[in-house]
């Protein structure tokens, strides 16, 4: 089939290619291989997009592109259309993200994609289910944190999402509140999203550009030339930092490196060289501290699996000190306390949105951000109920014909992407 004069072919869903399936829960869902075969993208003009989709509002916008809430006119289905600027990402990276998300969609704790994949003149576009309550970052009161019952509901579901991914030998590599989507503000139903950096265990990747507070120490220390072999431990570490953030409304440190005094204090505690507790960790109970010691073990091989958090959720995680909101101002970056002396009980900084990119591969899609500073929001008041395990739902069915590859002169040419080598 040539691009200039393509032959018609029947509509098909975007599926993952490759022999075999992953064992365990969800068996039967094919996993992506390193060779993606003959995925097709249909080109739509702006007028064609508005013909099929009614714009409700813009959900987010950044240098990477934008996310729009739309209604597909054919069925009335609400969905989030993600427009990714072609200048900011490669086609193979876009297809990788869509394919991996699709392969994981059988989990009720991972965002689902619709059978909607196309391109415009400037963007690659795909559709995923709409999360009406935004993301987890939006509801965390800065320097206060969320109620413990809300946190436990969220952590339970994220642990199941990570266990599902890791059981298929896939590592998310960008776990943070911005990538956790909410269907209600009490976290009764949350889903993990944004798989643009996901890779298979053992895949060697370049060092990421810069670091964020969720980045594991071994990633911070990796050399730019050698890179790092992907391991589930980086997700477990980020999961531990995320739990700290949602409980406190603060970062535990700015970066997991020796230049950060708060991280160095934590390292001394982990190695048994600090009398007492690190200043930022005194609010936690003994069970919570044991949980953090496992999730945030300095050596990746000593970190427990993500699902290990479940046995700690039956305990109280924070003490009475947790209920006292912190009104301390952030210290300027150059005004840090000396590493040799005791640190005062103050936060290294309130939560802010973060972006991680692949080194040397151009900017990748980042989650939509309203701003670079946290927004004050009311604290949700949860109803005390046991941590729920949502029932698996049916995968969303999108409008047909988005990946059919059929020629239509009124809608531009058909672009074929064949035999793309992708490391996952």
UniProtKB/Swiss-Prot annotation:
Give the span(s) annotated as Disordered. 321-373, 390-412
Q: Which catalytic reaction applies to this protein?
A: L-seryl-[protein] + ATP = O-phospho-L-seryl-[protein] + ADP + H(+); L-threonyl-[protein] + ATP = O-phospho-L-threonyl-[protein] + ADP + H(+)
UniProt binding sites for ATP: 59-67, 82
Which source organism does the UniProt entry give? Homo sapiens (Human)
GO MF entries? ATP binding; protein serine kinase activity; protein serine/threonine kinase activity
Return the protein name: Serine/threonine-protein kinase SBK1
Q: Pro residues bias: where?
A: 390-399
Q: Which UniProt keywords apply?
A: ATP-binding, Cytoplasm, Kinase, Nucleotide-binding, Serine/threonine-protein kinase, Transferase
EC number of the protein: 2.7.11.1
Q: List, from the UniProt record, the residues annotated as the active site of this protein.
A: 174 (proton acceptor)
User: Top enzyme class of this protein?
Assistant: transferase
Annotated Gene Ontology cellular components are: cytoplasm
Q: Which residues form the Protein kinase domain?
A: 53-318
Q: InterPro entries of this UniProt entry?
A: Kinase-like_dom_sf (IPR011009), Prot_kinase_dom (IPR000719), Ser/Thr_kinase_AS (IPR008271), Ser/Thr_kinase_Sbk1 (IPR016234)
Q: Name a Pfam family for this protein.
A: Pkinase
**Which compartments is it annotated to reside in?**
Cytoplasm
Q: Which family does it belong to?
A: Belongs to the protein kinase superfamily. Ser/Thr protein kinase family.
This molecule's function is given as: May be involved in signal-transduction pathways related to the control of brain development.
């Amino acid at each position: 089939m040539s691009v200039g004069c393509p032959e018609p072919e029947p509509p098909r869903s975007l599926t993952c290619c490759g022999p075999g399936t992953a064992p365990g829960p969800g068996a039967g869902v094919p996993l992506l291989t390193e060779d993606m075969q003959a995925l097709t993208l249909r080109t739509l003009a702006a007028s064609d997009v508005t013909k099929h989709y009614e714009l409700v509002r813009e959900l987010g916008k950044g240098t990477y592109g934008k996310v729009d809430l739309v209604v597909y006119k054919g069925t009335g289905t609400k969905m989030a259309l993600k427009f990714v600027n072609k200048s900011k990402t490669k086609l193979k990276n876009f297809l990788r993200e869509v394919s991996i998300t699709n392969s994981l969609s059988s989990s009720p704790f991972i965002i689902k994609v619709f059978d909607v994949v196309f391109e415009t003149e400037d963007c690659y576009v795909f559709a995923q289910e709409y999360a009406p309550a935004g993301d987890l970052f939006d509801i965390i009161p800065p320097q206060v944190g969320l109620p413990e019952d809300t946190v436990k509901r969220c952590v339970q579901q994220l642990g199941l999402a990570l266990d599902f991914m890791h059981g298929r030998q896939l590592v998310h590599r960008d776990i943070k509140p911005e990538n956790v989507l909410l269907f209600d503000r009490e976290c009764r139903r949350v889903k993990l999203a944004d798989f643009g950096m996901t890779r298979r265990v053992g895949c060697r990747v370049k060092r990421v550009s810069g670091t964020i507070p969720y980045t594991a120490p071994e990633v911070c220390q990796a050399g730019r030339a050698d890179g790092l072999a992907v391991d589930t431990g980086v997700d477990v570490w980020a999961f531990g930092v995320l739990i700290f953030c949602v409980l406190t409304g603060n970062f535990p440190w700015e970066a997991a490196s020796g230049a950060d005094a708060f991280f160095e204090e934590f390292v001394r505690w982990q190695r048994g060289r600090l009398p007492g507790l690190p200043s930022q960790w005194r609010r936690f109970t003994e069970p919570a501290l044991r949980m953090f010691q496992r999730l945030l073990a300095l050596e990746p091989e000593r970190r427990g699996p993500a699902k290990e958090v479940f046995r700690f959720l039956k305990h109280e995680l924070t003490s009475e000190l947790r209920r006292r909101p912190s009104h301390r101002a952030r210290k300027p970056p150059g005004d840090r306390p000396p590493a040799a002396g005791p640190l005062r009980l103050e936060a290294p900084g309130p939560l802010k949105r973060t972006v991680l990119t692949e080194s040397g591969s151009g900017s990748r899609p980042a989650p939509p951000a309203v701003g670079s500073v946290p927004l004050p929001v009311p604290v949700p008041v949860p109803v005390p109920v046991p941590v729920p395990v949502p029932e698996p739902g049916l995968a969303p069915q999108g409008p047909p014909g988005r990946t059919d590859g059929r020629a239509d002169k009124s809608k531009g040419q058909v672009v074929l992407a064949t035999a793309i080598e992708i490391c996952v």
